[in-house]
Structures are given as C-alpha cells and as structure tokens.
Amino acid sequence: MAREKFERKKPHVNIGTIGHVDHGKTTLTAAITMALAASTGAKGKRYDEIDAAPEERARGITINTAHVEYETEKRHYAHVDCPGHADYVKNMITGAAQMDGAILVVSGADGPMPQTKEHILLAKQVGVPNVVVFLNKEDQVDDAELLELVELEVRETLSDYDFPGDEVPVVAGSALLALESLTQNPKIVKGENKWVDKIYSLMDQVDAYIPTPERDTDKPFLMAVEDVFSITGRGTVATGRVERGTVKVGEAIEIVGLREAPVTSIVTGLEMFQKTLEESVAGDNVGILLRGIQKKDIERGMVLAKPGTIKPHKSFEAQVYILNKEEGGRHTPFFQGYRPQFYVRTTDVTGKIESFQADDGSETQMVMPGDRIKMVVQLIQPIAIEKGMRFAIREGGRTVGAGVVFNILE
C-alpha cells in the first residue's frame, strides 16, 4: 500500500545565535542542524558550510550572514549565524535578518565576555523579544559549582539589560562533542547520546519559551507611499507595498508624515496589476484610491495607516552603525551638529545629530567611521516613526550608516 503523503504546515520562527567570539555559536548552529536532521529527515549542515557565510547587502551595507533552516516537531525555524562580530552588529542594526528570539551562547569555561554584553544590549535595543541561553563547553568545566556561578552571572547580566534573567531557560552542553558524535553517526536519536540530548533539550526550550510571532497580516495596517497620481473623475491614488496588516475598500485610513497633523480619508478602491480588489494584505504592491484627497496633499515619504496606530515625530534616539572607509562609508569622523539625510522607508529627510553616547552612557564628541554609537536625532520634518524602525543615514546619495530607533523623544 502506498504511504500517504505527510504534509505539515508548522508555525515559522526566525532565530539566531548571538554571543562572544569563539564561544561556539557556529559549532552550535551546525550541531542543531545535524541533530534535527537525524530526527526530521532534513539536511544537516557542516561547520565549514555555515562558516563560509555569503555576503549580502542590506540598506547599502555588506554583511556576511549564514542562513540555515531546520524543523522541530512543533515548528519550522530559519536560523541566522554571522561569522564576525562586526557582521552581528550590522545585521542586528539593519534588521537584515529579523530575529523573533535568540540563542545566547556563553562558554561555561569563560562566562560572559565583552561581546556577550554587547550582543545582549543590541538584542534589547533592536527589539529581539526573547533569549534562551546555551552554556557551551560544559565538558571543559570540572566543577559543577563553577558552572552554576557562570549561569548566575549570565542571568544577572541579562537582568541588567532588562531581560527576565530569572526566567530565561539555561541549558548546558557541549556543541563540539555533540557535533563530533553526529558527524561519526548522523542517525543518533534521542536518548542515545548524552551530548546530543542536550542539543534536543535546548531546542525543546526554544520551542516552549520563544513565542510564535504575530503574523504581519494580524498587525495594524501600514503602507509607505512610493508614488502618487490622479485619475480623472476618480480621485487620487497612492501606490506602495503594504508593510503590515490588511486594508479593505470602505475603511478609514490616516495619512501620516511630512505634515504636523495626520489627515483622515476613506479607501474608495484598491488595485493590483490593473485588477480591482476588495482587500489588500501585507506584501501586496497596491494602488489605493483615496476619497477627497488632492494630489498635492500626499507625497512619497508619507505612510497610510490604520487611524491612531502611528504618529509623526521629529526627534528620536537610535543605535547606529557608521560604515568604515572600506565599506564605502566616510573617510573622516563627524561631530555633533552633523546634518545628513535619514532615509526612512521611502524617503530622505534631513536631520541634525544633537548628541552621541557610548554604551556606558558617557557622552562622546566625535564618531569615527566603523563606530557603533547611540545618537539623538532631530529631523526637520515630522515623519511616521516607531520603536524598532530601521533607517539608513545617507550623504549625497551614498549610505554612510544604518540605524534602528529605540526611543521616541517627541
């Protein structure tokens, strides 16, 4: 008898490994893919396949990122791992690979190191909502008490950065020993090998602790306006890609940005590829016909949104990465009062950089190419801004930096 085809539609979650250099992020990534390949029949990835990460471009910045995918019984995961520390910083700030949760890898032999803390801080600021900890290199720690001390230190560090350090799941193990066992015998199943079982228990915690993200279509409607034209006898059409949510004919929307106050209108028609629609959803490239709006009232850079869900702002705090010379960025430092363009969604808005702060909160006077810095920005026009929003910093049309908003000031 032919076997029935077994299909499953599992919820999808994006995660990544973060942590200090050489604490075992890539080894763990390889061990997870190999262990789950054994149980779900997918393809495992070797360390060297993940380590040779291809270059990608996001917001004008080149980043090396490795993407792997795997499945547990409950979910499908897309997992991002970066080879170098600078790639992590760039990846998290540009949002090139959005993370719904992260596995923080800490060597049990060393405990939290400077980059451990930097990655936790970045995760908090760029809005990675949940973290699960893997205490790696357990085989190198002879004393169980030492491992407990490291675990306490990791929990305290997480609490320092406003993660719930007492609740975060912590799993100890050895990614290397698990990977070596799986390389010798790729068919190891649960219960056959102590080290491989620790990888399974880590993924059980990830399954249980990191919530399934809200789907884009369930969020409130937002579309950045890319182009505007008028249709004689019918009115004004704004086109763009629906960033999130859904919109139906007859619904009220707000036009936000580049003016002090939002304007409300009614959607009288939706068009996609010359066909009319009743409803448009996240991901659609669509033309939205708006009642009672003149062509001069709306322009590229504004957004259409569900009323009351997003407001225009001029001032915000952001975490920013400034490109170095080799990456095509500036060759010279810049100072407070620097006025570049901030490219947000679909448009450039000039802004003035009011102040800079280092990670420890100390003020700095100048920023060098290649630095990561916190800054306060004052835009000359209000635009629709929200926490977690990404932007590029440009100067004469070329990208000199990338940032993420973590606080709105007015």
Curated annotation (Swiss-Prot):
Recorded GO CC terms: chloroplast; mitochondrion
Keywords recorded for this protein, A-Z: Chloroplast, Elongation factor, GTP-binding, Hydrolase, Magnesium, Metal-binding, Nucleotide-binding, Plastid, Protein biosynthesis
Pfam short name (any one): GTP_EFTU_D2
Catalytic activity field: GTP + H2O = GDP + phosphate + H(+)
Gene3D superfamilies in the record: P-loop containing nucleotide triphosphate hydrolases, Translation factors
GO BP terms: mitochondrial translational elongation
Region (G1): 19-26
Positions of region (G3): 81-84
Occurrences of domain tr-type G (ranges): 10-214
First-tier enzyme category under EC: hydrolase
Cellular localisation: Plastid, Chloroplast
Sequence segments annotated as region (G4): 136-139
Protein task: GTP hydrolase that promotes the GTP-dependent binding of aminoacyl-tRNA to the A-site of ribosomes during protein biosynthesis.
Family stated for the protein in its record: Belongs to the TRAFAC class translation factor GTPase superfamily. Classic translation factor GTPase family. EF-Tu/EF-1A subfamily.
Name of the protein this chain belongs to: Elongation factor Tu, chloroplastic
Native source species: Chlorokybus atmophyticus (Soil alga)
Source organism phylogeny: Eukaryota, Viridiplantae, Streptophyta, Chlorokybophyceae, Chlorokybales
